[in-house]
Curated annotation (Swiss-Prot):
Catalytic activity: di-trans,octa-cis-undecaprenyl diphosphate + H2O = di-trans,octa-cis-undecaprenyl phosphate + phosphate + H(+)
Assigned GO CC terms: plasma membrane
HAMAP family according to UniProt: Undec_diphosphatase
Bilayer disposition of the protein: Multi-pass membrane protein
Record's protein name: Undecaprenyl-diphosphatase
First-level EC class: hydrolase
Alphabetical UniProt keywords: Antibiotic resistance, Cell inner membrane, Cell membrane, Cell shape, Cell wall biogenesis/degradation, Hydrolase, Membrane, Peptidoglycan synthesis, Transmembrane, Transmembrane helix
Protein's organism: Bordetella pertussis (strain Tohama I / ATCC BAA-589 / NCTC 13251)
Amino acid sequence: MTDSTLHLLKAFFLGIVEGLTEFIPVSSTGHLIVIGDWINFASSSGKVFEVVIQFGSILAVMWIFRARLWQLIRGTLTGVRQEVNFTRNLLLAFLPAAVIGAIFIKSIKQVFYHPGVVAVTLVVGGFIMLWVERRAPHTPGDAPGAADDTASDERASAHTLEQISAKQALGVGVAQCVAMIPGVSRSGATIIGGMIAGIQRKTATEFSFFLAMPTMLGAAVYDLYRNIGLLSQHDMSAIAVGFVAAFLSALVVVRAVLRFVANHTYRVFAWYRIALGLVVAAWIYAK
């Protein structure tokens, strides 16, 4: 196997990792940092590779929600109240991370982008998820790990996207700021933040997917603009392979997650985070 073929296989693998982990609460960035280090993936285009494969993931979620997205855009432009309110909530949730990111993202990456930080945040985030899920009420007859995702969930005040309040949306936005630290997980922070704010689990998950569109698109455009000079012709094939792999795998994951959260909690992901964090810590210690 030639070096160029091996490089493409690594890019394909990392694209799959990005697509599989971007929309579940396990931290795609943390996985890319750790696994990229494990397989010794080196891109001459630097940050551009990561930006492009994340763009592949966000295009997948936009494709899946294309009908609802078009309804949102059309309704907002024509003044439909519930669509205007939904757009307002997305803007409120987007702004905190946009402001904090514009000011501090360079410092955050310099200080926190390290496997050791990922190990700690994976474990801590896992225990926080377990704590939040433990607070979620269950109905009699639920299977182990299943939760009530109906209006009988008395602790949730928002059971649909239209019922989310401006205060709840802003709370989700503040939670998203924490996800700038690798290993925290953007989807995990926004979903758990939403649940703490009183948004039902499935609705919080859907809101997280919609919030990912402006957040990830904005971050991708900003990072691509800042790093376009690093783009190498030699790396174009690897970037294209990673993009396609991320897009296709994200298509599968987003649909699967929406089905999963209708009848299950996020506990399995919490335990996965804790286990992976301990493995990463052991690997760092053994190096």
